[in-house]
Curated annotation (Swiss-Prot):
Protein's GO biological process: terpenoid biosynthetic process
GO MF term list: O-acyltransferase activity
Keyword line: Acyltransferase, Membrane, Transferase, Transmembrane, Transmembrane helix
Inducing or repressing factors: Expression is down-regulated by the cluster-specific transcription factor AOL_s00215g275. Expression is also down-regulated by the HOG1-MAPK pathway downstream transcription factor MSN2.
Name of this protein: Acetyltransferase AOL_s00215g273
Bilayer disposition of the protein: Multi-pass membrane protein
Natural source organism: Arthrobotrys oligospora (strain ATCC 24927 / CBS 115.81 / DSM 1491) (Nematode-trapping fungus)
Domain of life: Eukaryota
Enzyme class label: transferase
Listed InterPro entries: Wax_synthase, Wax_synthase_dom
Protein location: Membrane
EC number: 2.3.1.-
Length: 483
């Protein structure tokens, strides 16, 4: 029925939980199929797919693992009687103003289950993730316009990222001579390798944001009934860049909160058994509980991402010649290093701020420009280094890729994967825009060239347009002769 166990598990943790939650708690059918999602996930773990491309299997594994963690919370962690734990609510700010009763009719129960399973960050429920103060557009038209601008901006970023990666791949493979020989030398630099790894993360994250923006624009534009058609149900996926002034703030405010519930729920459950109710705790137990939750959340996050690599690392077919044989790869669990180290960094950061009396409140930090700037610099440095060294390198190694199989290829596999990721979603309008603009550019370029103005400025403009136009390096050598 399904091509492999992973695909079956993905269907099992999306469709079946909705059916289970739609049925009365006393239903025999509900009892019968209740363990089925867990069994399908267990089957995928014990008998993972062994054929196919590692990258595709990794992405499918990440999606399945993410969804299964979420459904584990809804179905098993909170107990059999989900309607008693998950409540639809109305809010004004962070205050719950109304609690809706569980529907009595079958159709209402199906809608209730579907709303819970598809809820974004628990919005409209008592499990809603804390949101930053959001200023929503004043009208539906303004909201649609804002979404369109975001979509076009993301498409432009993906197009530019993919084009640059194609450019660098041809340089590394020496498929054409480049007027910029220093580009090849950049890939021997560890810092630039980190930047390249960061581009891969950008492409993957941008695809998620793009899909999210398309979905919210369609739902709000169509005026679909229920929570999906409300503007308030679709806040921006990420916080503001200006809030990335500390490691804790990056994870708590700037980064997306889509997984927050499923990552924190296991720790919350264990801490409630150990510490009891938080308001009743003394200062020291409350502090211990606070950091226990931080460590447990990142522990679950590391496991989630590692399991995705576990599936990808089991595939035999590798798309690059520099692939490492299956028996020589490091363990799939090395991917979790990046996430396991984050709570230690946050704890150290908190201790230093406490010991030096440095403000950790958003208003206090932003009021002092030096404090904000220093925080932004060290945070960006930490994530640029950590993403490459603690995440990308171990993950690629476990999937079979070597960091530098030889001095010439180096990071070519990351660039190829990033380019493919940047072009995976269709309907990108920018290639057509560049193709349309090109004739006009050449006319203007010829005019200024004939007038003797420009120099290297026009060479750079020429090269940029050729890269974005997808013509590669076949014209770059001749471009150097125009100055």
């Amino acid at each position: 029925m399904f091509e492999n166990t992973l695909q079956g598990a993905l269907i099992g943790v999306t469709v079946i939980p909705t059916l289970i939650l739609s049925l009365p708690t006393t239903s025999f059918v509900r009892y019968a199929i209740y363990p089925l999602p867990a069994l399908l996930v267990l089957r995928a773990l014990l008998w993972p797919p062994t054929e196919g491309l590692a990258k595709e299997t990794y992405l499918l594994g990440l999606l399945m693992t993410d969804t299964s963690f979420k459904m584990f919370d809804y179905l098993y962690l909170q107990g059999y009687n989900a309607p008693a734990k998950f409540l639809q609510v109305d809010r004004v700010g962070r205050t719950i103003t109304k609690v809706h009763e569980y529907p009595k009719d079958t159709l209402g129960q199906v809608k209730w289950a579907l709303s819970l399973v598809t809820s974004h960050r628990g919005i409209g429920w008592n499990i809603q993730v804390p949101l930053q103060k959001i200023k929503y557009p004043s009208s539906r038209v303004a909201y649609i316009f804002e979404s369109m601008v975001s979509i076009l901006s993301i498409y432009l970023g993906l197009y530019t990222c993919g084009s640059l990666c194609d450019y660098m791949v041809q340089v590394l493979r020496k498929e054409a001579d480049s007027p910029y020989p220093w580009v090849y030398g950049l890939f021997k630099n560890s810092i630039f390798q980190m930047v390249v790894a960061f581009m891969g993360i950008f492409a993957m994250v941008s695809n998620s944001v793009l899909v999210y923006n398309l979905a919210r624009m369609i739902c709000v534009t169509s005026g679909i009934k229920g929570d999906w058609g409300k503007i308030e149900s679709w806040p921006n996926m990420f916080g503001g860049f200006e809030d990335a002034w500390s490691i804790r703030n990056v994870w708590g405010r700037a980064w997306h909160q889509n997984l927050r519930r499923c990552l924190t729920a296991p720790g919350e459950k264990v801490s409630s058994l150990i510490f009891g109710s938080s308001p009743k705790l003394g200062r020291v137990p409350r502090l211990i509980r606070r950091y226990f939750l931080v460590f447990s959340a990142f522990g679950v996050s590391g496991l989630l991402h590692s399991l995705a690599v576990y599936y990808g690392s089991k595939t035999d077919t590798m798309p690059y010649e520099d692939s490492t044989p299956l028996h020589m790869r490091p363990g799939w669990y090395v991917t979790g290093y990046f996430f396991y180290i984050q709570p230690f960094a946050i704890t150290l950061e908190d201790f230093i701020c406490w010991a030096t009396g440095t403000s950790t409140e958003s208003k206090g930090v932003k009021a002092t420009k030096v404090r904000w700037f220093v925080g932004m610099v060290y945070t960006l440095t930490w994530f640029t280094w950590g993403t490459a060294v603690l995440w990308i390198h171990p993950q690629l190694a476990s999937l079979g890729y070597q960091r530098t199989s030889d001095a010439e290829l180096g990071y070519v596999h990351i660039l190829v994967s990033t380019s493919e990721a940047a072009s995976i979603l269709p309907l990108n309008p920018w290639p057509a825009v560049v193709k349309t603009v090109s004739p006009t550019f050449w006319d203007v370029y010829g005019y200024f060239k004939s007038s003797g103005l420009g120099g290297y400025l026009y060479l750079y403009a020429y090269t940029t347009l050729e890269i974005l136009g997808g013509s590669g390096f076949n014209v770059l050598k001749s471009a150097s002769s125009v100055v």
